């Protein structure tokens, strides 16, 4: 086995997932209110990680239609990716990270993300063997998909705010300005 410093690093960004069977690879991501699900089959020696922004699906009326932002889509992709590479559903185990409350608003998207991930895995019959969710600071996450080892580092307030800026949905484009005026 390679030393920790020599591990092949694969960074996961929002809306992505990766499945690997390389014992010398480590998956990493930076999380604010987003959640990362880390799943593996310990017998097959394969695992993966996803990184989603919002719970639910892109079919809801307020979603904006980008499926890669949503937990339902990325959870299904991760599970199916593991199964395609030889994992068995009955051997999968999960760890959940992220879901911080990084923006003080009325709704806590981070909490909703974490609750969604836990409920999704419960519904799928996949045990959650570890989790670290909530709080008010982001985290850097590392996950070794073959061994199942995970490590997180808390982010400072400034690092969390930079992460939040990356997670926020871009503003809708401005509506075109009317060139004519009608008086009544």
Swiss-Prot record:
Keywords: Chemotaxis, Hydrolase. Pfam families: CheD. Probably deamidates glutamine residues to glutamate on methyl-accepting chemotaxis receptors (MCPs), playing an important role in chemotaxis. The keyword Transferase does not apply. GO terms for biological process: chemotaxis. It comes from the Bacteria. This is Probable chemoreceptor glutamine deamidase CheD. Its EC number is 3.5.1.44. It comes from Rhizobium leguminosarum bv. trifolii (strain WSM2304). Belongs to the CheD family. GO terms for molecular function: protein-glutamine glutaminase activity. InterPro entries: CheD-like_sf, Chemorcpt_Glu_NH3ase_CheD, Cytotoxic_necrot_fac-like_cat. It catalyses: L-glutaminyl-[protein] + H2O = L-glutamyl-[protein] + NH4(+). It is an enzyme of class 3 (hydrolase).
């Amino acid at each position: 086995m390679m030393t920790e410093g020599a591990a092949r690093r694969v960074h996961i960004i929002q809306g992505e997932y990766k499945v690997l069977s390389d014992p010398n690879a480590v998956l990493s991501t930076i999380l604010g209110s987003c959640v990362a699900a880390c799943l593996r089959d310990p017998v097959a020696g394969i695992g993966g990680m996803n990184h989603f922004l919002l719970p639910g699906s892109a079919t809801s009326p307020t979603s904006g239609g980008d499926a890669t932002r949503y937990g339902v889509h990325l959870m299904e992709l991760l599970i199916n990716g593991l199964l395609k590479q030889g994992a068995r559903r009955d051997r999968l185990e999960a760890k959940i990270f992220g879901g911080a409350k990084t923006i003080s608003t009325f709704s806590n998207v981070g909490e909703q993300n974490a609750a969604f991930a836990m409920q999704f895995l419960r519904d799928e019959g996949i045990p959650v063997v570890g989790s670290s969710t909530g709080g008010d600071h982001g985290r850097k996450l590392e996950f070794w998909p073959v061994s199942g080892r995970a490590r997180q580092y808390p982010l400072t307030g400034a690092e969390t705010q930079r992460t939040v800026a990356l997670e926020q949905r871009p503003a809708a484009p401005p509506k075109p300005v009317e060139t004519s005026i009608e008086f009544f």
